[in-house]
């Protein structure tokens, strides 16, 4: 498919455009409030990252939300970067990932055209509600992005492999 600017659009370019739009739009408030955290949740996340403890007891593995820390702890411990700076970078990256998920869901599950899916991703990225949720709740943003990428796998539930893959992705 050709765009009005003469660029041929593919799914990989659509994902890249959606990720870039989400990243840039979510990065603006982080840059404006640079040395300070935007949300009070960021202080909570930074505390756990600095403490280095995800689970106080092994049983909290099943009752706590640890997936965000699973991605951020190794980066924080190996690079030694400040936890607030890492969270200021992780927020826009996670929002870009979620915007990509909206595009992928519209393209794969709903069967929309490339232009319509790009519009859905662009519309999601400028909504104030989605921007607000992504600034406060990084764990929810990660979970929503993973859900949007996992839902198109439901179409492949006719095979055992597809069922197992979608259940693993959703759990």
Regions found by a protein language model. Give the residues of each.
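Membrane-interface alpha helices of multi-pass inner-membrane proteins
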Residues: 161-171
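Short, motif-level signal for alpha-helix interfacial/capping segments enriched in acidic residues
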Residues: 4, 19-20, 118, 154-158
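A compositional/structural signature marking long, glycine- and acidic/polar-rich segments
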Residues: 145-149, 154, 166
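N-terminal membrane topogenic signal
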Residues: 1-18
């Amino acid at each position: 498919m050709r765009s009005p600017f003469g660029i041929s659009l593919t799914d990989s370019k659509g994902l890249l455009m959606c990720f870039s739009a989400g990243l840039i739009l979510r990065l603006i408030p982080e840059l404006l409030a640079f040395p300070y955290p935007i949300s009070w949740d960021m202080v909570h996340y930074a505390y756990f990252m600095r403490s280095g403890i995800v689970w106080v007891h092994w049983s909290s593995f099943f009752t706590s939300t640890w997936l965000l820390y699973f991605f951020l702890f190794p980066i924080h411990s190996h690079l030694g970067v400040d936890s607030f700076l890492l969270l200021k970078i992780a927020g826009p990256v996670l929002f870009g990932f979620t915007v990509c998920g909206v595009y992928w869901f519209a393209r794969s599950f709903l069967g929309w055209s490339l232009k319509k899916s790009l519009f859905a991703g662009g519309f999601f990225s400028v909504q104030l509600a989605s921007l607000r949720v992504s600034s406060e709740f990084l764990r929810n943003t990660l979970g929503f992005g993973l859900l949007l990428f996992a839902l198109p796998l439901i179409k492949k539930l006719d095979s055992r492999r597809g069922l197992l893959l979608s259940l693993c992705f959703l759990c």
